[in-house]
Structure formats: structure tokens, C-alpha cells
């Protein structure tokens, strides 16, 4: 725990455990607030009016979204046409989408069997929702943007029962208001990409250049080193270096760093860092890996991207499936490595061996979920470091057959913020 609380940002740590509870901890780790199981806990977001909004799998498979306040009063319930399965983002009050203010941007998907093209792809859409009426103003089907030909990296285990295809796995979307551009993060393509709002016109793709269809290659951003010189990606050594130390892999929580300059988009992201390569031979194993926080600047005029800053976690913070961070008004950074897994000897593990990382683990078969939570200053000095664990080691040998596919998912945190008790 922090030795000098005066260095910490104000507020409580609000943590949303996937399909468990939302809780708030003070700087000593004491629980100061929580919601009961009947309230959704997954993609918790505090709105400008001080209320929270969230959807979860327990609430009709993400098809019911609740707006509730700090004392548990439900102010609105949204019956959704498309499931809002990952991050939610409220645009500023001055931004109007097709003449509508107070809009929510949500990672979403067509319900099974309802795709207009009859396809089986999932978690590959973005919904724009009017928070005043609950109406879905627009839906972006990203199959029409990126296609389905590129292999996933990382991925989820195949859905053998239903045959669905989680080829993109959108986990965050928001509108960059300066450039009127929809920014979207796709975990299973390790890509962040931008569309002109209201269209399917692609503007850029941020991610490793390997294996993209030729027709999309002109949208790939060129990576720049800290001194402004570009990586030469025709050189295999430099391309491998960029994969290992520069590019985003399995990223989450892609959010804007304010910059009002037209043609410039600054973002921060939680770089899970799965694999760090499109080839197994060059991939980093979970026990040698770490998740990172990256701050990047995208220049749409030069089609380049440069890393402005990076914060690393060490092996104790490697999270193969989720994670989030927040920049505080005092310059501190709060981060949750929300999908960290370890065996009983402390060896970092991955959530889905062979899919989320290379299937090579020398562990003892035990798995415990842990949620390392940190607050750092702007220089990366750790001021607060606490870990919440499931308190339970699972082993595939003592798990019922019906649960073997998910036995590693015993505690995860998709969203965490440091906020005042009342907004």
C-alpha cells in the first residue's frame, strides 16, 4: 500500500468484476461500496450525470443495459437490439451524431442468426445509441471494412457447438471528435483502426503489417522510433523488432488523449502483448512476457504512428485477456492487469493455451486468477500496488467436464477506474 497517500489521485478504485460484483476500494484496500449480483458487472461506465451504465452476460446475454445510481436505483433499462458485450463510451455533450447529442458508442454484435448476410461472425460491430431514447442510431458491421480473410492472433478457442467466428473481437470504440472518426480496437486482429463517421471509409490501420490483404495495405500506418525515424519493415530484423517492442498485441481500453490538432489522434491503450509476433518461432512465452501501457500519436497526414511513452508491468502483470488504465487529473496512471493468471509456484500463465499464447507452459497445472492494481506517477514510479486474488487454485484434474473450457477464468476484471464516490 502507498506510504504517502498525498501522492495518490483523489477517489476510490471502482472495479467491475466480470459477472460478479462492482466494488469500490479506498486507498487502504477497504471495500466502501458494492453492487449486488442482480446488477450488471462487466463494462461499467460512469456517465456525465453521475450515474453508471453497464450490461453483462447475466442480464439476457448483454441485451439489457442498466443505468443506475450510487444507491442502486435503476433509472433506465435499455432493451438492446444488438448485444453490447464490451466497452461503452459516452461522447461529449457538445458532439452531435446525426443531430443527436448524448450518444453512447458501444462494442456490439448482431444476435446469432440475425446477420443480414447469414454469416456466423460475432463481436464485430459498433452501435451508436441515443441515451435519451434508447434508440440505436447506427450500426457499423466491420466485416464490410476489414473482411474475414486474415488469420487471428491472438484468438479464442473455436466454437464447435455453434460454429461462430470471433475473428475481430471488438473491445473498445469511440469517436474522435476533432477528426470526426470512429476509432475501433479489435483484439483478435491486434489492430486499432479508424473510419470516417457515418461511412465505411477506412482511414488507417494501426498494427503489425503481416498478412493483411493487399487491398488494405495502403491503410497501414508506418511505425516511427522515438527519434522520428521509421522502421524499415522490408528488413526482417527491423520488422521483428517492431513486433516485439512497438506494436499493439491483443490490446484493450483504447482511449483518447486530448489533442485538438486536425489530422492528429493521440491514444492510450492497454497492450496485453500476446505473442508479439505472427509466427510461433518469434513469439514471447507467457512466463517471459509482460503487459504494457502505450501512448501513441497517429498522424493521418503522414500515415505514421509514434510511441510517445510506455509503462511496463513486469511478469507479475502479464494479462492475456483483458486490462485497463486511466490517466488521472494529477498526472498519475491507474492500471488494472485484470486477467493475470499464475500457477501455485508463481509462474505467469495464459488464459487459452494455443489461442491466447503459444501452448508451451512448464507449470504444475494449478491456476489462480489475480488482479494486480497499481497507481503510478507520470514517470512510472509505482505509488500504490495491491493484488486481489480469487483465493482459489484450480486444476483441470478436479474441474467438472462441463467447466474445463473455462477453468482458468476464475476471476477477471474488464473495467476499473479511480473516481469520486459521487460523480
Spell out what each predicted region is.
Residues 1-423:
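Histidine-/acidic-rich catalytic cores in large beta-rich domains
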Amino acid at each position: 500500500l502507498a506510504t504517502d497517500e498525498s501522492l495518490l489521485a483523489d477517489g476510490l478504485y471502482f472495479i467491475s468484476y466480470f459477472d460478479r460484483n462492482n466494488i469500490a476500494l479506498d486507498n487502504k484496500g477497504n471495500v466502501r461500496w458494492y453492487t449486488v449480483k442482480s446488477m450488471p458487472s462487466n463494462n461499467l461506465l460512469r456517465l456525465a450525470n453521475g450515474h453508471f451504465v453497464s450490461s453483462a452476460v447475466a442480464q439476457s446475454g448483454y441485451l439489457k443495459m442498466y443505468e443506475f445510481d450510487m444507491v442502486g436505483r435503476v433509472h433506465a433499462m435499455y432493451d438492446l437490439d444488438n448485444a453490447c458485450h464490451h466497452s461503452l463510451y459516452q461522447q461529449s455533450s457538445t458532439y452531435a451524431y446525426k443531430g443527436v447529442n448524448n450518444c453512447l458508442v458501444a462494442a456490439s454484435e448482431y444476435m446469432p442468426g440475425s446477420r443480414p448476410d447469414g454469416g456466423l461472425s460475432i463481436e464485430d460491430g459498433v452501435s451508436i445509441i441515443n441515451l435519451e431514447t434508447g434508440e440505436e442510431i447506427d450500426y457499423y458491421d466491420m466485416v464490410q471494412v476489414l473482411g474475414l480473410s486474415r488469420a487471428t492472433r491472438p484468438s479464442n478457442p473455436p466454437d464447435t457447438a455453434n460454429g461462430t467466428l470471433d475473428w475481430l473481437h471488438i473491445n473498445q470504440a469511440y469517436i474522435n471528435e476533432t477528426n470526426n472518426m470512429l476509432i475501433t480496437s479489435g483484439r483478435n486482429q491486434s489492430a486499432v483502426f479508424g473510419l470516417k463517421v457515418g461511412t465505411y471509409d477506412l482511414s488507417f490501420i494501426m498494427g503489425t503489417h503481416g498478412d493483411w490483404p493487399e487491398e488494405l495495405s495502403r491503410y497501414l500506418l508506418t511505425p516511427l522510433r522515438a527519434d522520428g525515424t521509421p522502421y524499415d519493415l522490408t528488413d526482417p530484423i527491423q520488422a521483428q523488432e517492431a513486433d516485439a517492442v512497438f506494436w499493439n498485441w491483443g490490446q484493450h481500453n483504447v482511449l483518447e488523449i486530448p489533442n485538438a490538432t486536425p489530422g492528429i489522434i493521440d491514444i492510450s491503450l492497454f497492450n496485453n502483448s500476446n505473442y508479439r509476433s505472427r509466427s510461433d518461432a518469434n513469439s514471447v512465452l507467457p512466463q517471459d512476457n509482460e503487459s504494457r501501457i502505450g501512448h501513441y500519436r497517429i498522424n493521418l497526414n503522414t500515415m505514421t504512428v509514434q510511441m510517445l511513452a510506455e509503462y511496463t508491468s513486469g511478469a507479475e502483470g502479464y494479462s492475456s485477456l483483458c486490462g485497463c488504465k486511466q490517466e488521472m487529473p494529477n498526472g498519475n496512471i491507474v492500471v488494472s492487469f485484470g486477467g493475470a493468471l499464475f500457477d501455485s509456484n508463481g509462474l505467469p500463465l495464459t488464459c487459452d493455451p494455443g489461442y491466447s499464447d503459444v501452448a508451451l507452459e512448464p507449470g504444475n497445472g494449478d491456476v489462480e486468477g489475480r488482479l494486480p492494481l497499481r497507481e503510478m506517477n507520470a514517470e512510472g514510479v509505482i505509488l500504490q500496488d495491491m493484488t486481489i486474488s480469487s483465493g482459489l487454485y484450480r486444476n483441470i484434474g478436479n474441474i467438472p467436464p462441463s467447466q474445463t473450457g473455462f477453468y482458468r477464468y476464475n476471476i477477471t476484471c474488464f473495467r476499473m477506474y479511480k473516481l469520486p464516490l459521487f460523480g
